[in-house]
């Protein structure tokens, strides 16, 4: 039944596109890629020299990834140098859309963290592959790569396979993050000029709620004055940690209302959150970070966080799960296989858990990028989505942030009524809820948590395609 409906979605989209460490680091910190492996992993492929010297065809040919057994997806991978002084390099893995790649939008995916590898998004959420416990590669039923050309980048420098040779090569602000990503994108579209004419979207989840607006703002600012213009059409952010102040201020009440805190625990949590917000207002960034870390994450705190102690759970990504699903970490072992490393051109380069990235971005953890998001909402298509079951950036906390934003549609947004969203008219199940004002779409997806495409792959697939291809939110005929 599900496959039949999936075929219906695909057929509709075929017609549609035919011509005419921080706060959210725990899930990534638990994914450890061993640096010990046997066999020939090949050599890292650095593509910037090919780009600089105009050897485009050779660079494309060298970056092509050998297909995995049973798979036939075309893809390209390698390193782009974004700072020669510090030898800072960003790793990318690019999948042209299976369907009409010559016209399909190019979608950049950025994982959160800070320090979470976008390989998590590729293997766990919406890439073409799923890794099983015995290291078998199987095809995903609802890959975003079916209709979209997906560009996965390990970001910032020092995340996953991305690396730098100097401590000054690490980002310490969102400006640094955006600058490195912009450099990578300009080089990427030079290496793959056939995709430079296509619409471009910046997407991500969680802490990427900072990266995405930062990069979009950077592109928006530079496009008018640069010869090469990136065809930015919009952004999409899942469970967006964009404005920490408004989110943190709502934690205690939300956790109490869903039964994870009792009355006394709520009072303590609220007191600490209020203190954290006070420090944010005073720009005492490290003091605010330390309070938040002790309350929620426990990355630099000795022992468990307050949240972990009182709930008994390490997983704050889905209210129905107390620990992280084991299958979310299978890809880590896969990335140690020498034949895989050789195929994606990383050689014996270490895979970082992002701890050093988080260290350099600690002050950034509690800073807001709300002005940049407001700017983007004034000019481009924007999708902000939440999983109904998320805890750490819950739908209610996102709405708390959105209600506090000032953009040209803010008044209309506050008055707008949300509508029920179903994928098919015959569905008994509701996929979620949508509130739309102009080019802005806010979506809550039922039955999913923070790692939404993992929990609800079909609904996520439908959502991203409705948004990017402007299909609206009316249900399809069965």
Curated annotation (Swiss-Prot):
Which Gene Ontology biological process is one annotated for this entry? proteolysis
* Residues bearing attached sugar chains per UniProt: 83, 134, 309, 350
Could you say which enzyme class this protein belongs to? hydrolase
Q: From the UniProt record, which GO molecular function terms apply?
A: serine-type carboxypeptidase activity
Q: Identify the PROSITE patterns for this entry.
A: CARBOXYPEPT_SER_SER
- Annotated disulfide bonds: none
Q: What does this protein do?
A: May be involved in the digestion of phagocytosed particles in the lysosome, participation in an inflammatory protease cascade, and trimming of peptides for antigen presentation.
Q: What is this protein called?
A: Probable serine carboxypeptidase CPVL
| Classification lineage | Eukaryota, Metazoa, Chordata, Craniata, Vertebrata
Supply the gene name. Cpvl
């Amino acid at each position: 039944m599900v496959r039949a409906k999936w075929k219906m979605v695909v057929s509709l989209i075929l017609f549609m596109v035919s011509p005419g460490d921080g706060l959210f680091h725990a899930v990534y910190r638990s994914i450890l890629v061993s640096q010990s492996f046997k066999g020939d992993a090949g050599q890292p492929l650095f593509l910037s020299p090919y780009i600089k010297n105009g050897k485009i065809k050779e660079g494309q040919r060298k970056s092509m990834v050998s297909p995995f057994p049973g798979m036939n997806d075309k893809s390209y991978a390698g390193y782009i140098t974004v700072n020669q002084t510090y030898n800072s390099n960003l790793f990318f893995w690019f999948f042209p859309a299976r369907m009409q790649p010559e016209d399909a939008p190019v979608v950049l995916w950025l994982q959160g963290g800070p320090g979470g590898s976008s390989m998590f998004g590729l293997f766990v959420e919406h890439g073409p592959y799923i890794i099983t416990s015995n290291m078998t590669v199987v095809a995903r039923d609802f890959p975003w790569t079916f209709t979209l050309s997906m560009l996965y980048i390990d970001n910032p420098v020092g995340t996953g396979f991305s690396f730098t040779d100097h401590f000054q090569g690490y980002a310490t602000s969102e400006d640094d993050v955006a600058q490195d990503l912009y450099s990578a994108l300009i080089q990427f579209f030079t290496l793959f000029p056939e995709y430079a004419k296509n619409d471009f979207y910046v997407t991500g989840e969680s802490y990427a709620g900072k990266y995405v607006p930062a990069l979009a703002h950077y592109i928006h600012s530079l496009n008018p004055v640069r010869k090469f213009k990136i065809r930015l059409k919009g952004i999409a952010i899942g469970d967006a940690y964009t404005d920490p102040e408004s989110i943190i201020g709502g934690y205690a009440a939300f956790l109490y209302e869903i039964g994870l805190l009792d009355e006394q625990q709520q009072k303590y949590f609220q007191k600490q959150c209020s203190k954290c917000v006070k420090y944010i207002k005073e720009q005492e960034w490290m003091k605010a970070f330390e309070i938040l870390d002790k309350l929620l994450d426990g990355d630099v705190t000795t022992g468990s966080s307050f949240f972990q102690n009182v709930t008994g759970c390490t997983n704050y990504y889905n209210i129905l799960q107390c620990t992280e699903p084991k299958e979310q970490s299978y890809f880590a072992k896969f990335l140690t296989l020498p034949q895989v490393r050789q195929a994606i051109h990383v050689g014996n380069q270490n895979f970082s858990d992002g701890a050093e990235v988080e260290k350099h971005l600690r002050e950034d953890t509690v800073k807001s990028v709300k002005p940049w998001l407001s700017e983007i909402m004034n000019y481009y298509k924007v999708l902000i989505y939440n999983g109904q079951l998320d805890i750490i950036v819950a739908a209610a906390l996102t709405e708390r942030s959105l209600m506090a934003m000032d953009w040209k549609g803010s008044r209309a947004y506050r008055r707008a009524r949300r509508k029920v969203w179903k994928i098919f008219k015959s569905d008994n199940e509701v996929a979620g809820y949508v509130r739309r004002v102009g080019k802005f779409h806010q979506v809550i997806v039922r039955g999913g948590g923070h790692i939404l495409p993992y929990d609800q792959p079909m609904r996520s697939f439908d959502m991203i395609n409705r948004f990017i291809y402007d299909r609206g939110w009316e249900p399809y005929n069965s």
